[in-house]
């Protein structure tokens, strides 16, 4: 207990018999009305409801109970323990309130559920729905740098399609040159609005197709010796 407070129940008598002198000494300055402390065994329910003009009062749990320069009524119902402040709630959620929730409110208003909590929850849900339903623009998708083919769901590149004019020009070039130099490949790519890589892949596939066709033709045609043997018979 602080030494600035004096227990009024303690008999202030001196062994020398100067009782009258002790009663004449003022305990506090003029105009100062201090809180009367009580022993630890004194119950909280018997605290008198009295109006004090204290400038500010703070609870031990770092949460402000009242902060007003005007007169404020401190009664037994305004004092709460740390357990009550952290656990007591009408909704049973156990949410710890901030310091501003206890300013200038009665005990009934302090634990009244906030009417704006439902609105805040609705705004949060709306924001979450907006996040998941946001439109996907074409520039947000993964695209093929050559012809604009969108990648599939498994990240596979789409099959490149050529127009009829592009196919005709490539076939004409393949008829004269089955292998292209890089310079010629760049010229054809610029003329047909394609990339050098697409031209290279198309010629590789076309050469494989041409080899298969030649192999099939050679296998179906009989050799010269077989034809002569059949003719001699």
UniProtKB/Swiss-Prot annotation:
DNA-binding region: 155-214
Gene3D superfamilies xrefs: Homeodomain-like (1.10.10.60)
GO CC, one annotated term: nucleoplasm
Pfam families xref list: Homeodomain
Polar residues composition-biased segments: 107-119
Major localisation: nucleus
CDD domains noted in UniProt: homeodomain
Molecular functions (GO terms): DNA-binding transcription factor activity, RNA polymerase II-specific; RNA polymerase II cis-regulatory region sequence-specific DNA binding; sequence-specific double-stranded DNA binding
Motif Antp-type hexapeptide positions after renumbering to this chain: 136-141
Subcellular localization(s) per the UniProt record: Nucleus
Database matches in InterPro entries: Antp_homeobox (IPR050296), HD (IPR001356), HD_metazoa (IPR020479), Homeobox_antennapedia (IPR017995), Homeobox_Antennapedia_CS (IPR001827), Homeobox_CS (IPR017970), Homeodomain-like_sf (IPR009057)
A biological process term (GO) from this entry: embryonic skeletal system development
Function: Sequence-specific transcription factor which is part of a developmental regulatory system that provides cells with specific positional identities on the anterior-posterior axis.
Family: Belongs to the Antp homeobox family.
Name the UniProt record assigns to this protein: Homeobox protein Hox-A6
Species annotation: Homo sapiens (Human)
Species lineage: Eukaryota, Metazoa, Chordata, Craniata, Vertebrata
Gene that this polypeptide is encoded by: HOXA6
């Amino acid at each position: 207990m602080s030494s600035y407070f004096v227990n009024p129940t303690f008999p202030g008598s001196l062994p020398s018999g100067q009782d009258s002198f002790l009663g004449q000494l003022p305990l506090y300055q003029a105009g100062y009305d201090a809180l009367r402390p009580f022993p630890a065994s004194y119950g909280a329910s018997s605290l008198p409801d009295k109006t004090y003009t204290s400038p500010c009062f703070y609870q031990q749990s770092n949460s402000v109970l009242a902060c007003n320069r005007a007169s404020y009524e401190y009664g037994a119902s305004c004092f709460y323990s740390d357990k009550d402040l952290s656990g007591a709630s009408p909704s049973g959620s156990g949410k710890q309130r901030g310091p501003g929730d206890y300013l200038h409110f009665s005990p009934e208003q302090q634990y009244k559920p906030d009417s704006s909590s439902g609105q805040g929850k609705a705004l949060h849900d709306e924001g979450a729905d907006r996040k998941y339903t946001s439109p996907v623009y074409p520039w947000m998708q993964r695209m093929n740098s050559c012809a604009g083919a969108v990648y599939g769901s498994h990240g596979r590149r789409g099959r490149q399609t050529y127009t009829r004019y592009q196919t005709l020009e490539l076939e004409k070039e393949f008829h004269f040159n089955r292998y292209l130099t890089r310079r010629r490949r760049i010229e054809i790519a610029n003329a047909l609005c394609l990339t050098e890589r697409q031209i290279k892949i198309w010629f590789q596939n076309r050469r494989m197709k041409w080899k298969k066709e030649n192999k099939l033709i050679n296998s179906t045609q009989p050799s010269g010796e077989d034809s002569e043997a059949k003719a001699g018979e």
